[in-house]
Amino acid sequence: MSEVTSYIVEETSFNHSVRKFLKRWHYSDYVNIQAKHTFCLFKNGKFGLPEMIGVCIYTRPAGPSAAQSYHPENPDKVLELRRLCLIDDTPKNAESYFVSRTIKWLKKNTDWEFVLSYADEEQGHRGTIYRACNFNYLGKTKAGKTLEVDGERFHIRTLSMMDRPYGVEINKRWKEKDEGIKIIETLPKHIYTYNLVKHKYIKFEKKNYEKT
């Protein structure tokens, strides 16, 4: 029996322990996200106590038009798988096991209809995990832009978030041509989707993943 089948997946809150885990293990340590569903992966640790070894975060889509574009029938029922990270010392199939269990939970316990996720080629990710979980591959996005503030990357929309203190501060520094703030061109991302309600109409044709 595979080791991962003994792992436990739990839905929880976006709490301090989750934030701390993301800061340590995710390549983007930006944790100011509005989580809709937070899942943790546990294994038996020392003295039989559960040890957190993974976090998976679902949010509403970051781009305002993404939900409408990929699921126009009911854009309010779209989630984005925004964060997925595990500790380094996990079996090869641990990530796909984790994601598949979160999908199963969403199907059983919620009325969400559609999941969207992106594999970031900037980080060498091409969506192997999503393909293993039977996500649909829809090709690539256009090349994008990201905001770098003092070496830390933020979504480009941060510049227009004038209702938030950090948005106001970053916008002010940008207008003052602060050298600590840069706009960086990014590679296209791979687009993956999953239909939680199978009978729903799929607007976009699935594509074959091409290795490059």
What is each model feature region?
Residues M1-I33:
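Short amphipathic alpha-helix that is part of the acyltransferase structural core
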Residues E11-T12, T59-E179:
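Acyl-donor binding region in acyl/amide transferases
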Residues K36, L187-Y192:
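Short hydrophobic/aromatic beta-strand or adjacent loop that forms the aromatic wall/cage
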Residues Y27-S28, N44-K46, L86:
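Short beta-turn/strand-loop junction motif enriched in small, turn-promoting residues
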Residues L22, A35-R60:
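Conserved beta-hairpin
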Residues T193-K198:
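Short beta-strand-to-coil "C-cap" segments at the C-terminal boundary of structured domains/repeats
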Residues E176, T186-L187:
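Class I (Rossmann-like) S-adenosyl-L-methionine-dependent methyltransferase catalytic domain
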Residues F204-T212:
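Short, cationic low-complexity segments
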